[in-house]
C-alpha cells in the first residue's frame, strides 16, 4: 500500500533533543512531580501514581535526566528522585519474601488498581521499571543503596524463573504464586539483565 503522507512538510521548529528537553522540563514542573520535593508519598491528584513501578519509576528516571540536562535544577530534581525512590523502597516486599525487593504494580484504589482482580496482585515484569530507575539514580549519585535495590530485584527474578525459562505474567504480591497460566513476554527482563551485565559487569 502507498503511504498516505504527502509533502511538502513544514520545517521543524526545533530538533529532537530540544523537544525532549522541553518534555522532561514540562514533566518536572507538574504539581504532582513537584510534590515529591517535600513528600515521600505520591500526590494522588495525579491518579496514574497508582502504578508505582511504571509511573513513579518513570518519575525517578525523568528527574535524573532533568539533573543532567538542567544543572541549575539538579539539586531539586535529585531531591524529587530520592523521595520517589524512598516511596518505592518503603512499598517493596521485604528481603525474605518470595518477591523480595519488588515494589508493587498497583497502589490504593485508583483506575485499574481498584479492580478486584488486581487487588493484592502484581505484574511480574514491572519491577524491571523500578530497577532501571534505581540504576539511573545510582549512576548519578553513586549511592550504593540504589544499586543494591536493583541487584536485589535481579536476584529475585532468578529465583522466580520456571524450569522452562518462563515467568508467570501476574502473581500474588505476598505469596508470589501465579494467578493464572499466562506467561510473560520477556523483553523487559532481558533488557534489564543486559544492562546489569554490560554496564556493571554483573553476571549471575
Segments and roles (model prediction):
Residues 31, 70, 88, 92, ...:
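Alpha-helical junction/boundary sensor with strong preference for TPR arrays
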Residues 51, 118, 122-125, 142, ...:
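Structural signature of alpha-solenoid helical repeat scaffolds
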Residues 143, 150-167, 171-204:
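Solenoidal tandem-repeat scaffolds enriched in leucines and small polar residues
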Residues 1-13, 57-75, 118, 128-144, ...:
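Well-ordered alpha-helical scaffold segments within catalytic/enzyme domains
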Residues 108-117, 171-176:
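Acidic/His metal-coordination segments adjacent to aromatic residues that form catalytic metal sites
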Residues 1-58, 76-111, 162-166, 204:
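Low-complexity, Ser/Thr/Pro/Gly-enriched N-terminal "stalk/linker" regions
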Residues 46-47, 118, 177-178:
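Short, recurring structural edge motifs at helix starts
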